[in-house]
Swiss-Prot record:
Superkingdom of the organism of origin: Eukaryota
LRR repeat start and end residues: 170-195, 196-221, 222-247, 253-281, 282-307, 308-333, 334-359, 360-385, 386-411, 412-437, 438-463
Assembly: Part of the SCF (SKP1-CUL1-F-box) E3 ubiquitin-protein ligase complex SCF(FBXL7) composed of CUL1, SKP1, RBX1 and FBXL7. Interacts with AURKA; interaction takes place during mitosis but not in interphase. Interacts with BIRC5; this interaction allows BIRC5 to be polyubiquitinated by the SCF(FBXL7) E3 ubiquitin-protein ligase complex.
Region described as Disordered: spans on this chain: 1-79
Family: Belongs to the FBXL7 family.
Compositionally biased region (Low complexity): 10-26
Biased composition (Polar residues): 27-55
Organism in which the protein naturally occurs: Homo sapiens
A Pfam family that the UniProt record links to this protein: LRR_6
F-box domain residues: 111-157
Predominant subcellular localization, coarse grouping: cytoplasm
Location of this chain's protein in the cell: Cytoplasm, Cytoskeleton, Microtubule organizing center, Centrosome
Name of the featured protein: F-box/LRR-repeat protein 7
Keyword terms of this UniProt record: Cell cycle, Cell division, Cytoplasm, Cytoskeleton, Leucine-rich repeat, Mitosis, Repeat, Ubl conjugation pathway
Amino acid sequence: MGANNGKQYGSEGKGSSSISSDVSSSTDHTPTKAQKNVATSEDSDLSMRTLSTPSPALICPPNLPGFQNGRGSSTSSSSITGETVAMVHSPPPTRLTHPLIRLASRPQKEQASIDRLPDHSMVQIFSFLPTNQLCRCARVCRRWYNLAWDPRLWRTIRLTGETINVDRALKVLTRRLCQDTPNVCLMLETVTVSGCRRLTDRGLYTIAQCCPELRRLEVSGCYNISNEAVFDVVSLCPNLEHLDVSGCSKVTCISLTREASIKLSPLHGKQISIRYLDMTDCFVLEDEGLHTIAAHCTQLTHLYLRRCVRLTDEGLRYLVIYCASIKELSVSDCRFVSDFGLREIAKLESRLRYLSIAHCGRVTDVGIRYVAKYCSKLRYLNARGCEGITDHGVEYLAKNCTKLKSLDIGKCPLVSDTGLECLALNCFNLKRLSLKSCESITGQGLQIVAANCFDLQTLNVQDCEVSVEALRFVKRHCKRCVIEHTNPAFF
């Protein structure tokens, strides 16, 4: 299916010989005049180009008034209505004036000092500019226009906005960036289009075809993309390491395309180089899909499966078999994960540093004991809402994971001051502790924690029956600690 889609999209892309045939453009070629009615991005991240309004590549609604040119006339985009389109500026034209007339009209101006800088210095200066400033620089003169399109300034493309026609924007941008290196954007390493709901498989296929050096792709919340498009990207971008498909409900698996598997390309060797994978809210993902992911993505170190509600302990067994290098794992709100699943996770041993099992209602002290025994270098544990955890589970954890820095055991009603005391006497490096809605916690337990964990920075005791005196005691001993509470008498 991926191959068929590829042929369809590819044939369409070759049918156009110029950028102007794909999008309607309306530009102001007068370097000294500022364009009006162009929405500009205020993104302060200088390393990422927020292309919601990039000139060189403007993304703006066509129903805005036409851009005013130097003579006061306007040209509007009339071929496309009711959608956001990508617009690409042409270089500012060179004014042709007879030299005698120019000399007679006014004396020739001296060259500006900034124009004496070499191109590489100008590009370095441009690299520190936000997108809206780079847009203005592109309209100053022909030289600045060309420099603004230097591929080194476009290592990252970031598109934002729910209504933007992101498929067309990606097509226009990649085509322009491919002018110096036909058909490929060798410098482009990061594409972020999270929240662009109009992104479809067509847009991802454009990325797959044109960005062989892609290392990071974020398509969070783009619920129209499917497995086939993701397969195309991971098959044609062998260097991809970071993939965020959270909220993409149609994505149920990650694998190579059939063609890539048959060819056994040396770029892959049947393996995908992804190390970071976020599949939060991919609620259609099942154990078999996770099995396929684990078998192909053996280099995974960070995996987030929050609210993948169909996963069970069996899926975690597959994961541990193939992905032995996982450092961070989240299975929060996976209601079928139980102590048997934690027994499998414990096989990751000392490599595991981060674990989130929040609201996994089937987890008890038994599962916590497995993790505490084998994952001695655990630094972060989120067990909020695991109502089966008691003081015994906290004791196992405290005595074996002594370098624990962050612990969330909120909404664990069976945890009391006894568990807190054991925690305080063993985990001196604790920096973040959440006890929200722990009904059995009192001020005495908090005082023991404060007296031993001097580096505590965040303490959540909302909906806990603790006195003002206990909170003041914590504040005196942990001066940098931010206390989240619901006691109106403490401020």
